[in-house]
């Protein structure tokens, strides 16, 4: 599940569309990044660090991390100050990067096949299937929200399991059994541990 989740997060930036889409649709918004991301992932001259930096830049443009963080925190969001929200969004964005973008080296040529989309006002659902190297297909959905004239991804669903709901369950458990401050501490500790291990690998 973790492998498919990060894979979908990256590949949704490089959605292979097999059906024509009308101008201005959520699919069109995602398609803008297709050539860009695939060239990054498949460029043998780019180092892993360069690929991660390039994919991170694209991800920042197509993912609404603040919305994802807000929904992941659920009912606990409303009780937080603006400073606490800002800090949490930053920590959550770092967590997503460590969980998904840092693993782009695992990319092995998988593709996404577009299967449809549903638009309801400022919300949209883009459906696709991950095509693995063995030919099997895994259903994936991207939930999107319109911000101005741009459609942004705020949730990814793999085989009916939501990225947001997965994190919400974990975060809610920590807050209920301890506190919001404990959640923040854990996220900071996780980030520090990752940076320490990263420094050790590069030394």
What feature does the model see in each segment?
Residues 1-5:
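Positively charged n-region of N-terminal signal peptides that target proteins for export
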Residues 97-138, 190-203:
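Surface-exposed, charged secondary-structure patches
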